[in-house]
């Protein structure tokens, strides 16, 4: 089984957003706008990305 990863970038600030959404961004390991993280491609990570779709962008899969 291949080690699948996705690259996620924070495109908008979590300031002024719902507290649950801010915690989700923090859970993805994103702090600053423009920061990217390479994460495992799991259903839980995909769900977190879908929850804050308006603040993050999937750069690479």
Swiss-Prot record:
GO terms for biological process: translation. The keyword Ribonucleoprotein applies. Pfam families: Ribosomal_L30. One of its GO terms (molecular function) is structural constituent of ribosome. Keywords: Ribonucleoprotein, Ribosomal protein. Gene3D superfamilies: Ribosomal protein L30, ferredoxin-like fold domain. GO terms for cellular component: cytosolic large ribosomal subunit. Belongs to the universal ribosomal protein uL30 family. Part of the 50S ribosomal subunit. This is Large ribosomal subunit protein uL30. The gene is rpmD.
